[in-house]
């Protein structure tokens, strides 16, 4: 059985999100899906030395990233891991001579992401160095083109925290490139998240949120994926990517403006419509990541606070896409209003396995000055069934990743689902007032 996290004197107190990840990782030490990563596609006259200094300073300013956990006698001890800025170097690789330099670089990184993490060492190895929970590699893939690959363990930082770190690296690099002094550090300490959780526990706000989610779970939907499925394989995730650009992006933007919703709500509504149409009218079962950062200053903490919330996506016979958009947007607003509440482990009414939404409505386009930067996700976390991740491109397009559990979806099945989703999204956005049944793709 996993031990209970404890703290040494002056050691960090973990957030609820960190405790959840630690329990899951210790229950399955070989699970690599909590290793998450992305790369920045950097194009232009990059100064690798200045970038190294920007990354070094950022890692120094975020001590909450440097943790280790000691195991022994049924307990887990959280403690700070030493970080020596003067000895730290940004690893550099060059794949520019490969037949496909970008694919070669990504393959190297996927090998890193596929390594099972070692979060703790037994008591007999008390002096052993802790494996880092974060890492970055700069890969030259061509003339004036580099990939800054970032990988993290979810116990150290969540997706929003990664965005904070990336923007800080960009701000420091931009200032150094211009010859300006480093801008003041914007980060708030990790303890702010812990203190906010402590203040929330037992409060009237928590009671109101608990009551809301109890009502929400009183009438559980019929699952949108009713067919028998094999046991999930938590260690194998398949991916298919849908890109929305050009005329498709313009059509999506018009539909979003016309319905007064967000692009995140639009891509969710389209998937809800697809699952409804392809599963005999069963209501889609969804869950969504929420930042769970509502306390003052919480949005400045590069750490882990994310929560997973159930999301109803009801679709009714005769609905148009505009009607589904309005309903999904209302569900998003209600869920976010109660996003701090976490169900106790094993509590009744927990959301069943279904689609997990990993949307990034916050700004993910860092400004590196005279070097353009585009964020490309590589791995986004565990997937029990199906996950939809989306990130906005600097040019206004969308990258939508459909990740599937390898024990649930085969390659061809996922490829077909992604292709049908892309087609249906385009039709729905182009004709948002037509009944869904008139726009449905052919049955798979």
Each language-model region and where it sits:
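Acyl activation and transfer enzymes in specialized metabolism, enriched
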Residues: 13, 43-66, 150-167, 238-280, ...
């Amino acid at each position: 059985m996993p031990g209970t996290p404890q703290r040494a004197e002056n050691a960090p107190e973990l957030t609820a999100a960190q405790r959840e990840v630690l329990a899951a990782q210790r229950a399955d030490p070989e699970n690599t899906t909590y290793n998450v990563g992305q790369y920045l596609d950097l194009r232009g006259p990059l100064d690798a030395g200045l970038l190294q200094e920007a990354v070094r300073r950022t890692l120094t300013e975020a001590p909450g990233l440097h943790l280790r956990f000691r195991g022994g006698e049924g307990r887990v001890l959280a403690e700070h891991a030493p970080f020596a800025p003067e000895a730290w170097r940004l690893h550099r690789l060059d794949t520019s001579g490969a037949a496909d330099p970008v694919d070669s670089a990504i393959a190297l990184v996927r090998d890193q992401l596929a390594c099972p993490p070692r979060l703790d060492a037994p008591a007999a190895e008390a002096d052993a160095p802790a494996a880092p929970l974060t890492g970055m590699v700069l890969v030259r893939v061509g003339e004036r083109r580099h990939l800054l690959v970032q990988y993290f363990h979810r116990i150290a930082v969540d997706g929003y925290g990664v965005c904070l770190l990336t923007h800080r690296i960009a701000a420091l690099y931009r200032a150094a490139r211009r010859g300006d002094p480093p801008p003041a550090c914007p980060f708030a300490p990790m303890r702010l998240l812990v203190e906010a959780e402590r203040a929330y526990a037992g409060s009237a706000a928590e009671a109101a949120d608990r009551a809301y989610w109890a009502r929400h779970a009183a009438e559980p939907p019929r699952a949108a994926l009713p067919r028998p499925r094999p046991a999930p394989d938590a260690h194998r995730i398949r991916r298919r990517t849908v890109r929305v650009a050009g005329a498709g992006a313009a059509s999506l933007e018009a539909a979003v403006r016309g319905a007064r919703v967000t692009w995140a709500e639009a891509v969710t509504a389209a998937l809800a419509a697809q699952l409804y149409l392809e599963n005999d009218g069963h209501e889609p079962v969804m869950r969504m990541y929420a930042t769970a950062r509502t306390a003052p200053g919480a949005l400045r903490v590069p750490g882990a606070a994310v929560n997973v919330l159930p999301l109803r996506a009801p679709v009714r016979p005769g609905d148009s896409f505009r009607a589904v958009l309005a309903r999904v947007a209302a569900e998003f607003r209600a869920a976010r209003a109660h996003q701090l509440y976490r169900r106790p482990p094993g509590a009744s009414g927990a959301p069943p396995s279904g689609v997990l939404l990993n949307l990034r409505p916050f700004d993910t386009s860092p400004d590196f000055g005279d070097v353009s930067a585009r964020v490309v996700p590589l791995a986004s976390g565990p997937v029990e069934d199906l996950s939809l991740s989306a990130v906005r491109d600097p040019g206004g397009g969308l990258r939508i990743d459909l990740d599937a559990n390898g024990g649930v979806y085969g390659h061809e099945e996922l490829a077909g689902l992604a292709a049908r989703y892309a087609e249906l999204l385009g039709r729905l956005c182009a004709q948002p007032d037509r009944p869904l049944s008139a726009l449905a793709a052919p049955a798979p």
